[in-house]
Amino acid sequence: YKSNGGLWSLAYNRILPQGQFLSPREWGREDLFSFQKRERSEGSADNHALVLNYKKEFEVLKENLNLMSIISIGKHWKPEVTDAVLNKYAMPDYTHINLDIFFNIKKIKHLKPELLITSKIGNGDFPDNPNFYFNKVDLFHLDFIINYNF
């Protein structure tokens, strides 16, 4: 939905229990409607994902700098972490929040720095074992990326 304030989108994705989403990482990012940066549905069956996105562009310095921000909040329901058949990588249910800011520096045409702030919060009950949450949920991740497009 496009409004004067920005662009809104709501996406839902369902992977049935009889199937499993398999996508080699070499192929790049997943092309699912519910995709969020630093999120993977690969290896999941019986999976639900609901994601709300808000995109806004605004001027910071009229002649020098524009920003584009994308905020996304997603809720991802996964099978039990102990069910290796349906949940290949033992990923628990989680809430995923991203803030992605792109800097458009007008005087440097092809340079597009990006700041990505990500948080994943584990939801539900899962065994108190680091294999089920370490580098998967209950984390905060910050990236500063230098994009240069030729």
Predicted regions and their residues:
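Outer-membrane beta-barrel translocator domains and adjoining extracellular loop/strand segments
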Residues: 20-26, 79-87, 125-132
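Transmembrane beta-barrel architecture of outer-membrane proteins
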Residues: 12-14, 48-50, 73-75, 93-97, ...
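Flexible internal linker/loop segments at domain or repeat junctions
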Residues: 22-44
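Outer-membrane beta-barrel "beta-signal"
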Residues: 52, 136-150
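Transmembrane beta-strands of outer-membrane beta-barrel pores
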Residues: 3, 12-18, 29, 58, ...
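Membrane-embedded beta-strand positions of outer-membrane beta-barrel proteins
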Residues: 8-10, 54, 67-71, 101, ...
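Short loop/turn motifs that connect adjacent beta-strands in outer-membrane beta-barrel proteins
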Residues: 4-5, 59-67, 105-113
